[in-house]
């Protein structure tokens, strides 16, 4: 029997506000344990939450970017549960009326086709703290993350393969990043994914029993975990077994999923309206203000790169996959850089350097200005493409002007025949055996002189000019 895969994803995204959702404490990642906390985060008696307007701004932008309807009458709810990283014993979230609902996003699949994936809801909530278990037998609680603003985006169960889930996450990350509401860095926990997957016989409308997958710390692991679950569940069903409703985690080392807990039924969180936060309304004016702040999104930007700048579909897709890279490209082209040349450098030498150094574009000293200047001095013959690679590494590590560095470092390409011809004659004088081979008609003997000349000029001879002059002087040599 063949089965159809049914997948839905729940994505938690940390919003990039300066302070937390209900307290003035910093929401910055990476500080010492419990440095970003105050009495609200610790849930001292008598303290009251105050809603951060910037969180609602981000929620509105997310809803608009994901083609969602908005609940204009806003309220929050208490989700009750006890856990050490949750000192209040409840989480402030949204239950029956999330800020956004009934949305969709279009994704591009590997075969070039597109598919519209529904988004059931997006609700605002506070993050919990973090438990760590020490080797000394004690467990520790870090509340830096407690109260960091989240938006949870819940898809419809519209995905029918791990490939579609991967494509959905890629598109969602792009939209969220371009909207400017999160840096969506999975390695820092600012984007976290839970997956729900079930199988059903083809033609059956009723969903099968679902399994929830956790510990999916990269898009690649989401895909691998889902692929394993498809295989595991299919084997159980084909052997006459039944799927249990359970939560499993992905084991990256063994590329399997491991049982965490069996779900006997839906958890009863005893939701009720949050009494410490008043109801409020999102006005049409507020919504339109947020709409005007939304940028051009990846799909539109890709189309413009192809139609206006003459880039290929592949190049346009690669450049727009990351907003930082795309914005860098935009500025470089606006400064007069050739779109194809800038694209080639960003996808070639720049990408290789970033991978080797383990850094992002923001973490190096390369700027649109010095990249455009470097491309210009390649075009005008000041440096060769080979020398440019060395210049780029210097700019990436140290910044500064490309032309200034080239001149100070003595890297300017030699193009003047008055300088090159005497060097060519000296090469002939220094390599009598090669000259004899050439004069005797030995095959490919002339090619040796190219290497001799480049060595004599330390690679600074303009290849086009040097080869033309070398051919000219070799012809004279043969006549004599």
From Swiss-Prot:
Name the coiled-coil region(s): none
Signal sequence extent: none
Q: Indicate the enzyme's highest-level EC class.
A: ligase
Q: Name one GO biological process term.
A: glutaminyl-tRNAGln biosynthesis via transamidation
- For this protein, the parts annotated as crossing the membrane are none
**Catalytically driven reaction(s):** L-glutamyl-tRNA(Gln) + L-glutamine + ATP + H2O = L-glutaminyl-tRNA(Gln) + L-glutamate + ADP + phosphate + H(+); L-aspartyl-tRNA(Asn) + L-glutamine + ATP + H2O = L-asparaginyl-tRNA(Asn) + L-glutamate + ADP + phosphate + 2 H(+)
- Which EC number applies? 6.3.5.-
Gene Ontology terms for molecular function: asparaginyl-tRNA synthase (glutamine-hydrolyzing) activity; ATP binding; glutaminyl-tRNA synthase (glutamine-hydrolyzing) activity
Return the Gene3D superfamilies for the record: 1.10.10.410, GatB domain, N-terminal subdomain
InterPro entries the UniProt entry points to: Asn/Gln-tRNA_amidoTrfase_suB/E (IPR017959), Asn/Gln-tRNA_Trfase_suB/E_cat (IPR006075), Asn/Gln_amidotransferase (IPR018027), Asn/Gln_tRNA_amidoTrase-B-like (IPR003789), GatB (IPR004413), GatB_C_1 (IPR042114), GatB_Yqey_C_2 (IPR023168), Gln-tRNA_amidoTrfase_suB_CS (IPR017958)
Kindly state which keywords UniProt assigns to this record, in alphabetical order. ATP-binding, Ligase, Nucleotide-binding, Protein biosynthesis
Q: Does the keyword Iron-sulfur apply?
A: no
Record Pfam families: GatB_N, GatB_Yqey
Q: What does this protein do?
A: Allows the formation of correctly charged Asn-tRNA(Asn) or Gln-tRNA(Gln) through the transamidation of misacylated Asp-tRNA(Asn) or Glu-tRNA(Gln) in organisms which lack either or both of asparaginyl-tRNA or glutaminyl-tRNA synthetases. The reaction takes place in the presence of glutamine and ATP through an activated phospho-Asp-tRNA(Asn) or phospho-Glu-tRNA(Gln).
Family from the record: Belongs to the GatB/GatE family. GatB subfamily.
Q: How does it assemble?
A: Heterotrimer of A, B and C subunits.
Protein name, as recorded: Aspartyl/glutamyl-tRNA(Asn/Gln) amidotransferase subunit B
